[in-house]
Amino acid sequence: MKKNMRRWEAVLICMALLFSLFSLHTVEAKDEETPKTIFPVHVIHKTGDDKENFVIVIMGDGYTADEQDKFLQDAKQKAQGMLRWSPYKEYSDHINIYAVQAVSNESGISVYGGKNADTYFHVKVYGKAAGFSNGGDEKAKELRQDLEQNYLDRGANVATIHVLCNSE
């Protein structure tokens, strides 16, 4: 069990690093009373204006519509864990964390040479590594832009995205 947890932590860290390579840019948010985004967005941890803080977005892959409560619980647990680690712990009062409920058609994620799940981001595990397939990276970029334009505080940007994969 511990070995699997470490593997998934490594996968998530790799995914976060992958997304941090996307160029950061500032986009003015539209004037709307009710933010409209592709998927529901939940505040996990917010300490101030998104433009002034480091914005982390947790997105799920392999969570069906019926598993969205589980995703939110997993995302909260992941965020709480991150905020206990350095450097997040020291800067927790300058970090905002959001969860985006991306809905997959099938539960779980794809495994190279094995299961081929129909998920939103098409994350596939290749041994100890994971990556996007079938345009999943473009969907992640689209969701990032959607958040920056329609949800975050005016002029804010997403600093990093963590993709939480449902392994059950």
Where are these regions (language model features)?
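Zn2+-dependent metallopeptidase catalytic core
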Residues: 31-159, 164
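Hydrophobic helical h-region of N-terminal Sec-dependent signal peptides
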Residues: 10-22
